[in-house]
Amino acid sequence: MIKVKKKFGQNFLQDENIKNQIIQAIPNDVKRIVEIGPGLGDLTQKLVKLDSMIDCFEIDSELYTILLDKFRSELDSGKLNIINSDALNAWDKLSASEYFLVANLPYYVATNMILKAIDDKNCKGLVVMIQREVAIKFSSEAGDKEFSSLAILTWLKGKCELLFDVPSSAFNPPPKVISSVIRIIKDRDLSLNLKYDNFKNFLRVAFSAPRKTLLKNLSNLVQRDRLEIFFNTENLSHTIRPHELSVALYLKLFKEAENERRKQNPCG
């Protein structure tokens, strides 16, 4: 009997229907799949039946030993590779060639892991299970109360879909929250057209206080009178909240702010 290690956020998926739905969500033309946190290898058993090469990253040494024994034939044939490491610490190896990410991500690392994959040019997309609250933030659209910087950063690289919810009863042990599976297909990179790190900081400030007006939040970064000119030109209410502005207008406003910054600091 495996003892669950809370420090790794372990909840093992046991529902066969959910596993099959995850497999069906993976595009057919994927040559290499990276699975993070295979656990007992229940989903891995289905992944190795696909035409793709599979690389698994398992942080738990005890589970790693079990996986080596369980998938001995697949390892010998070269179909499967299992690495005993924290995926975040082995990202260079993980990202050595193009891949599609599949994972039941621990809640405590989910957001950072997804953002890292989104920014990785070798990652062509992902199907991951995460806490529903986080899934909504990634998949929401402008106007939704949950619309966030995560959705905007994702939109720059591709399309995010919330595919389905997963009840806690599908896991052992059952988590205290509802999970959801999202799929991101990366088919563009609009971050190349802007100073990406500056844009991330711009969004961080814009969404720093979701209940306050966007105008007030951004006044900490951009001169208020310049913001008011932009809002008036675009016929925007001065009382709109961060979640109410479209991605296109966020990009336009950021570029205006960058132009203003360069005028104020030509050498910066």
Swiss-Prot record:
Pfam families reported for this sequence: RrnaAD
Bilayer-crossing regions: none
UniProt GO molecular function: 16S rRNA (adenine(1518)-N(6)/adenine(1519)-N(6))-dimethyltransferase activity; RNA binding
Locations listed in the record: Cytoplasm
Enzyme class label: transferase
Family of this protein: Belongs to the class I-like SAM-binding methyltransferase superfamily. rRNA adenine N(6)-methyltransferase family. RsmA subfamily.
UniProt EC number: 2.1.1.182
Keywords assigned: Cytoplasm, Methyltransferase, RNA-binding, rRNA processing, S-adenosyl-L-methionine, Transferase
SUPFAM superfamilies, per the entry: S-adenosyl-L-methionine-dependent methyltransferases
Organism encoding this protein: Campylobacter fetus subsp. fetus (strain 82-40)
Disulfide bonds: none
Record-linked SMART domains: rADc
Physiological role: Specifically dimethylates two adjacent adenosines (A1518 and A1519) in the loop of a conserved hairpin near the 3'-end of 16S rRNA in the 30S particle. May play a critical role in biogenesis of 30S subunits.
Catalytic activity reported: adenosine(1518)/adenosine(1519) in 16S rRNA + 4 S-adenosyl-L-methionine = N(6)-dimethyladenosine(1518)/N(6)-dimethyladenosine(1519) in 16S rRNA + 4 S-adenosyl-L-homocysteine + 4 H(+)
Protein name according to UniProt: Ribosomal RNA small subunit methyltransferase A
Any one cellular-component term (Gene Ontology): cytosol
Chief localisation class: cytoplasm
Binding site for S-adenosyl-L-methionine: 11, 13, 37, 58, 86, 104
